C-alpha cells in the first residue's frame, strides 16, 4: 500500500501533536500551536502534511508557503520565525528496522516532492531537519542540495555538579567572579520580553540583517507555552537588566532559544551566569539534555557556545529549485533570505 498525503485541519491538532510526541525527532516547533503562531507572524500559509498508509500515520511534514513577486517559496521552517529547524518527522522512527526507515522516508519524500510540484507549484524549497535526523539521502536522491549544520547539546542527565565539572575552567572562574560582583539571575516574566526583543533586533542589525521587532511573536509564544514549556531567565546588575534568555522545554530537552545578547560590561560575564543558572534549573526540573541552539554557520558564535563543553549534534539543510531558470536566480534568493532572516 502506497503512502498518501493529507492536509491536516484544526480538528486534527490532537492527533498531530500525538505524532510529534511519538517521534524521537519531534520538537516543540512541530507542535500544532507553535506552527500556527509561526504562520501568523511570518506572512506564510501553513501546509501541515500528514503521511498515511491506508489509515495508519507514518509521518508529518509541516510546510510554509510564501509568495514573493512572481515566485512561490516553500520553507520548513520559514524565515523570520527564528527557528533553526523543522522538517519531516517519521512515527516511531527509532523502533523501525533500517530497511523500513529507508523505504518509508524515501517514498514519503517522493510523494512530498510530487505535492510541491503539482499542488503548490513551487519555485524554491528549503527544508531543515531536526537534530539527529541524520539520513539526508532521500533529499540527495531527489535533486536537493544538502548542507550539514550543527547544534550544541549538553548531557545533563548526571546532574548539575557533573555539568559544572565539565565546563571550561575559565568559564567556571568567570561565573564565580560575576556572582561575586553582584549579578543576580531570576526567572523573568512577560514584561522582560521587551528587553529581549530589543536586544535581539540590535544583534541582527550588527550582523547585517534587517531589524525586526519580535515582541508580539514572543508574547504569543509566552501565552501559549508558559510556564510548562517556555521559561525566561534574566540577569540584573545594579538594578538594571543586563542579559537574558528564553528556554523552550519539550520532552527530555531544554533548549536555549532566543537571548544572550552581547553585553558591553567589562570584567563580568552575565550571559555565562544566566546560562549556568538555566542549566541548573533544567537539571532540577528533570530534563536530560540542554541545547544551546546553533546552526554552525557563524564561527563568531563558536567561542561562546563551545566553552560549556557541549556535544555537536548534526542536522541538515536541503534546498531545491523547480528549474534552471530559478536556479539562475540563486543570488536573489540568497539576498531575500538574508534581509528576511
Predicted stretch roles:
Residues 3-71, 130-267:
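A conserved beta-strand-loop-helix scaffold within acyl/acetyltransferase catalytic domains
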Residues 50-57, 94, 219-328:
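Aromatic (often tryptophan-rich) hydrophobic motifs at membrane interfaces
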Residues 65, 131-132, 140-162, 287-341:
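Active-site/acyl-donor-binding loops of N-acyltransferases
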Residues 65-87:
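Conserved acyl-donor/pantetheine-binding loop and adjacent beta-alpha core of acyl/acetyltransferases
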Residues 79-90, 146-153:
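Acyl/amide activation-and-transfer machinery of modular secondary-metabolite enzymes
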Residues 85-100, 157-158, 259-268:
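A short, internal acetyl-CoA/4′-phosphopantetheine-binding micro-motif in the GNAT/acyltransferase core
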Residues 103-148:
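Non-catalytic accessory segments adjacent to catalytic cores
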Residues 125-126, 186, 288-293:
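Short catalytic-loop micro-motif centered on adjacent basic/acidic residues
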Amino acid at each position: 500500500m502506497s503512502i498518501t498525503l493529507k492536509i491536516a485541519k484544526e480538528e486534527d491538532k490532537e492527533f498531530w501533536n500525538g505524532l510529534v510526541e511519538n517521534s524521537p525527532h519531534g520538537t516543540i516547533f512541530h507542535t500544532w500551536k507553535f506552527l500556527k503562531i509561526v504562520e501568523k507572524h511570518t506572512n506564510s500559509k501553513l501546509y501541515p502534511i500528514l503521511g498515511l498508509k491506508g489509515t495508519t500515520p507514518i509521518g508529518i511534514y509541516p510546510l510554509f508557503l510564501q509568495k514573493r513577486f512572481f515566485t512561490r517559496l516553500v520553507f520548513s521552517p520559514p524565515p523570520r520565525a527564528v527557528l533553526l529547524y523543522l522538517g519531516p518527522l517519521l512515527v516511531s522512527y527509532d523502533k523501525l528496522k533500517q530497511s523500513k526507515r529507508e523505504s518509508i522516508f524515501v517514498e514519503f519524500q517522493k510523494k512530498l516532492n510530487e505535492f510541491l510540484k503539482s499542488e503548490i507549484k513551487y519555485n524554491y524549497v528549503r527544508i531543515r531537519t531536526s537534530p539527529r535526523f541524520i539520513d539526508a539521502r532521500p533529499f540527495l536522491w531527489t535533486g536537493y542540495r544538502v548542507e550539514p549544520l550543527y547544534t550544541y547539546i549538553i548531557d545533563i542527565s548526571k546532574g548539575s555538579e557533573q555539568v559544572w565539572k565539565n565546563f571550561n575552567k575559565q568559564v567556571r572562574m568567570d561565573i564565580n567572579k560575576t556572582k561575586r560582583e553582584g549579578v543576580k539571575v531570576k526567572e523573568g516574566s512577560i514584561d522582560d520580553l521587551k528587553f529581549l526583543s530589543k536586544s535581539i533586533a540590535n544583534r541582527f542589525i550588527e550582523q547585517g540583517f534587517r531589524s525586526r521587532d519580535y515582541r508580539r511573536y514572543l508574547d504569543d509564544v509566552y501565552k501559549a507555552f508558559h510556564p510548562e514549556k517556555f521559561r525566561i531567565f534574566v540577569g540584573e546588575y545594579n538594578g538594571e537588566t543586563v542579559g537574558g534568555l528564553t528556554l523552550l522545554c519539550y520532552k527530555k530537552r531544554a533548549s536555549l532559544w532566543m537571548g544572550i545578547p552581547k553585553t558591553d560590561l567589562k570584567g563580568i560575564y552575565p550571559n555565562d551566569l544566566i546560562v549556568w543558572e538555566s542549566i541548573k534549573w533544567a537539571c532540577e526540573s528533570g530534563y536530560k539534555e540542554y541545547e544551546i541552539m546553533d546552526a554552525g554557520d557563524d564561527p563568531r558564535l563558536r567561542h561562546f557556545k563551545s566553552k560549556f563543553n557541549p556535544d555537536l549534534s548534526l542536522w541538515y539543510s536541503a534546498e531545491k529549485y523547480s528549474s534552471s531558470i530559478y536556479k539562475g536566480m540563486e543570488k536573489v534568493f540568497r539576498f531575500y533570505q538574508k534581509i528576511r532572516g
